């Protein structure tokens, strides 16, 4: 049975200031770096064999901290990027016009054809995230990969594995540097294919490393 660990990146400057990131980028805050070190300590004894990350800076920063703790190198996969938020990227959430907020809500609510101009649909996000996960099946037997990605991207992936629509990701709370795990099993009496073992685990994060919602 293949086990794949999933980690969301640490808190970023734009997470803290409530700006839309998408595939634009901002660096980890001091809190985000601490979160990354804590999740690294959590997984270093799990026998991780591969660290695969989105090619965006915030995930690469997080992945490097984890890889150093595990004695591994980082491999990038652009399919693990966050949803492309088009013309709204870099914008403070509070600055959106009513029309722009409608674009955003239609997309996250699963309205047919919903997408931000110059951006990506939730269905497109789900397909590329699933392709990235399925690529783990091609790794050598006995591998235990860890993927570092983004909040909406990972939520969309987990939703689709459950047979839910991609926009169900908004019902999953995946905090910065939370840890999830999915397993690929082949069984005559259990559901074959990908199953979710855990999602959004933050047991490794201490109080200073938790976001305001958790506190």
UniProtKB/Swiss-Prot annotation:
It is an enzyme of class 5 (isomerase). GO terms for molecular function: phosphatase activity; phosphoglycerate mutase activity. Pfam families: His_Phos_1. Substrate binds at residues 8-15, 21-22, 58, 82-85, 151-152. The active site is at residues 9, 82. GO terms for cellular component: cytoplasm. It comes from the Bacteria. Gene3D superfamilies: Phosphoglycerate mutase-like (3.40.50.1240). Its EC number is 5.4.2.-. The keyword NADP does not apply. One of its GO terms (biological process) is glycolytic process. Pathway: Carbohydrate degradation; glycolysis; pyruvate from D-glyceraldehyde 3-phosphate: step 3/5. Keywords: Glycolysis, Isomerase. The record marks 150 as: Transition state stabilizer. Belongs to the phosphoglycerate mutase family. GpmB subfamily. NCBIfam families: PRK03482.1. This is Probable phosphoglycerate mutase GpmB.
């Amino acid at each position: 049975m293949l086990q794949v660990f999933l980690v969301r990146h640490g808190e970023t400057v734009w997470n803290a200031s409530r700006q839309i990131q998408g595939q634009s980028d901002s660096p980890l805050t001091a809190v985000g770096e601490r979160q990354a070190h804590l999740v690294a300590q959590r997984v270093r004894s799990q026998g991780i064999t591969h660290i695969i990350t989105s090619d965006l800076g915030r995930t690469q920063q997080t992945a490097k901290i984890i890889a150093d703790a595990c004695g591994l190198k980082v491999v990038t996969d652009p399919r693990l990027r966050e949803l492309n938020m088009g013309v709204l990227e870099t914008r403070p959430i509070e600055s959106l016009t009513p029309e722009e907020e409608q674009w955003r809500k239609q997309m996250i609510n699963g309205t047919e054809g919903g997408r931000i101009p110059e951006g990506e649909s939730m269905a497109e996000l789900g397909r590329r995230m699933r392709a990235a996960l399925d690529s783990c099946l091609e790794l050598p037997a006995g591998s235990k990969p860890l993927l570092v990605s983004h909040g909406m991207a990972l939520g969309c992936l987990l939703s689709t594995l459950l047979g839910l629509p991609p926009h169900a990701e908004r019902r999953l709370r995946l905090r910065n540097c939370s840890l999830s795990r999915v397993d690929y099993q082949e069984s005559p009496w259990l559901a074959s294919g990908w199953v979710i073992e855990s999602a959004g685990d933050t047991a490794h994060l201490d109080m200073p490393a938790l976001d305001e919602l958790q506190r």
